[in-house]
Amino acid sequence: MKSVSSVVLATLLAVNANANPFEGFDIVDLTHAFDANTIYWPTEKDFKHTESFAGETEGGWYYSAFSVQTAEHGGTHLDAPVHFAQGRWSADQIPTAKLFSAAVVIDVKAKTANNPDYRLSVEDIRAWELQHGQIPKGATVLMNTGFSMRWPNRLEYLGTAERGPEAVRSLHFPGFSKASAEFLAHERDITAVGLDTASIDYGQSTDFIVHRLLYERNILGFENIANLDALPPVGAWLIALPMKIADGSGAPLRIVGLVPAAR
């Protein structure tokens, strides 16, 4: 069976050279902008955007340039498998075809509204499949917790506004369960998982078992995604393009959804 990434690439290549290959799709930005309010793990430093020059030059034209400083894991970003699995793909080693996939969106907002420690269950996945069919080969499974609506309020989004190693024990946000990770890793042939919280493991995790299970199999992770409500449960495509950092355990990510336009 062909993977969904090969199917979508073949479809785009088959389009008339003079036609817009994205005609018929609404393009949804699923990325939080990087700025002074960007949320990082409590042990990481904030994003810095430092002006080198901005203004009129001696020649009379406008010119601006800035430098940036960022941790790999903050804002909307990629977790490369090597983040928790030695010898697996780093950010620059991920095959390009893995960055194009079908989107499977599992909405659990009703369950996370009063339970910030909720974890996606196998039952949630099976309920989605009962309605929409089996998760297609090569898909990205997205968990829509509704937490992106809390961005960039650190207290509401992370469960704590504290910083430093001692703050980690106070984190409260949803993630995938160990059982759901095992099911996706062994029973379904997926490319990636993603969600609109700071980690694919829930905030109170101390063993990061979801990271370890998935990344050992070179399954990618996308964290701090925005606007998942704009995607349907099935039928959309993802383009997820991380910064190509050599040996990177992760990278800032620009991720967009292609949603079939209503006719």
What are these regions (language model features)?
Residues M1-V4:
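Positively charged n-region of N-terminal signal peptides that target proteins for export
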Residues S6-N16:
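Bacterial N-terminal signal peptides
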Residues A19-R263:
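Active-/binding-site microenvironments in catalytic and ligand-binding cores
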